[in-house]
């Protein structure tokens, strides 16, 4: 059993005997009302999508999923093909199935993902907590600001934009925390 406040993208819960994938989860706590979790769910069997609001204390049935290591093999339009690293089986996912990690997926990446299966069917992937990506474009740094606390926008090679420290330059490798939408962690060790 899970509670409403434990929901996060990639979690699968059972509603009316169907498995539902949590694609988006936003925790909100206001002074007057109790804490709530706004979720965007996708039915893994039918593909139907819906949005449901849960209170933080709601009890939900979670689904036991199989997990395997996989790597991105190639991208064809909106279809992403992943390969199981143990038996080399290929699995396909649509872009909408991996919406939460899509900003950090790029052709040729070498990160080992965690493929999530429900009844032998690939339903989602999770990236490692920390990934390394190359900065494709960023503005020059302001003179004298080397403390690392001043942030500026940067664009990765796949088009994703995020805030990085002011001293980061084009072609620098940076570490990104993939949880909660992704954030800059620091310059990658060479």
Swiss-Prot record:
Family: Belongs to the elongation factor P family.
Biological process according to GO: peptide biosynthetic process
Subcellular localization, as worded in the UniProt entry: Cytoplasm
UniProt keyword list: Cytoplasm, Elongation factor, Protein biosynthesis
Listed InterPro entries: Elong-fact-P_C (IPR015365), NA-bd_OB-fold (IPR012340), Rib_uL2_dom2 (IPR014722), Transl_elong_fac_P/YeiP (IPR020599), Transl_elong_KOW-like (IPR013185), Transl_elong_P/YeiP_cen (IPR001059), Transl_elongation_fac_P (IPR011768), Translation_prot_SH3-like_sf (IPR008991)
Name assigned to this protein: Elongation factor P
Organism: Pseudomonas fluorescens (strain SBW25)
Record bears the keyword Cytoplasm: yes
SMART domains: EFP, Elong-fact-P_C
Record flagged with keyword Acetylation: no
Domain of life, per lineage: Bacteria
GO CC annotations, alphabetized: cytoplasm
GO molecular function: translation elongation factor activity
Pathway: Protein biosynthesis; polypeptide chain elongation
Protein purpose: Involved in peptide bond synthesis. Stimulates efficient translation and peptide-bond synthesis on native or reconstituted 70S ribosomes in vitro. Probably functions indirectly by altering the affinity of the ribosome for aminoacyl-tRNA, thus increasing their reactivity as acceptors for peptidyl transferase.
Gene name per UniProt: efp
């Amino acid at each position: 059993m899970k509670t409403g406040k434990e929901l996060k993208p990639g979690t699968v819960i059972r509603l009316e005997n169907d498995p539902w994938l949590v694609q988006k989860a936003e925790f909100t706590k206001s002074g007057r009302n109790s804490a709530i979790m706004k979720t965007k769910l996708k039915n893994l069997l039918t593909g139907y999508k819906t949005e449901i609001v849960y209170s933080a204390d709601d009890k939900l049935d979670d689904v036991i999923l199989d997990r395997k290591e996989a790597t991105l093999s190639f991208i064809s339009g909106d279809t992403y093909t992943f390969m199981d690293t143990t038996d080399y089986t290929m699995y396909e996912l649509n872009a909408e199935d991996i919406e939460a990690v899509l900003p950090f997926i790029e052709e040729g990446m070498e990160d080992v993902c965690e493929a999530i299966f429900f009844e032998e069917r690939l339903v989602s992937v999770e990236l490692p907590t920390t990934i390394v990506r190359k900065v494709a474009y960023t503005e020059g740094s302001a003179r004298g600001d080397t403390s690392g606390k001043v942030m500026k926008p940067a664009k990765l090679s796949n088009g994703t934009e995020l805030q990085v420290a002011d001293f980061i330059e084009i072609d620098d490798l940076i570490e990104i925390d993939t949880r909660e939408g992704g954030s800059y962690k620091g310059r990658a060790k060479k």
